[in-house]
């Protein structure tokens, strides 16, 4: 066929870099300061690794609960800085008027305003949709499977694969 593997990999990386930051999410608009529905967001973080188990980037995800669309994603460490970056990527209407459900991880409390934040235990089952999405992400993106032979060698490819899956997931959710 005449296509070299090096060119093909470069082409794929270029394609991953051009994926939209909005991830094809259809956020709720707040027109004329009137909200018709309550905005609910579930946020969570999950571990992954790049190249070796010691190199652990964390995947931070925020999901519009009623619509089941991933609205924000950040890959970084497990610090308050990463929580702030996830918060900054959430659409403005949700940051202003939404209720955010998270696990009881301490860094969320310093980032999300107290009036909007609900730190929930696993028994309350208010974060079951985001937990289910995390499982789906692990199943469908082979480099996130635990104890697997496939893994990312570069962080940019790791982020690109996650972003590609989320874009596809949101497009299928919007059509449903």
Regions found by a protein language model. Name each.
Residues 1-176:
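Residue-level recognition of single "structural anchor" positions
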């Amino acid at each position: 066929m005449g296509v070299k593997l090096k060119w093909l990999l470069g082409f794929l990386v270029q394609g991953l870099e051009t994926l939209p930051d909005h991830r094809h999410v259809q956020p709720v608009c707040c027109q004329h300061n009137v909200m018709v529905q309550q905005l609910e967001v579930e946020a969570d973080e999950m571990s992954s690794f790049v190249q070796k188990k010691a190199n652990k980037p964390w995947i931070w995800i925020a999901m519009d609960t009623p619509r089941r669309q991933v609205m924000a994603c950040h890959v970084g460490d497990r610090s308050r800085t990463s929580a702030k970056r996830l918060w900054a990527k959430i659409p403005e209407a949700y940051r202003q008027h939404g209720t955010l459900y998270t696990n009881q991880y301490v860094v969320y409390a310093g980032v999300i305003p107290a009036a909007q934040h609900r730190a929930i235990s696993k028994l309350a089952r208010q974060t079951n949709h985001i937990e289910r999405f995390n499982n789906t992400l692990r199943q469908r993106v082979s480099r996130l499977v635990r104890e697997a032979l496939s893994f990312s060698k570069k962080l940019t490819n790791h982020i690109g694969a996650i972003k590609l899956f989320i874009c596809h997931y949101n497009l299928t959710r919007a059509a449903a």
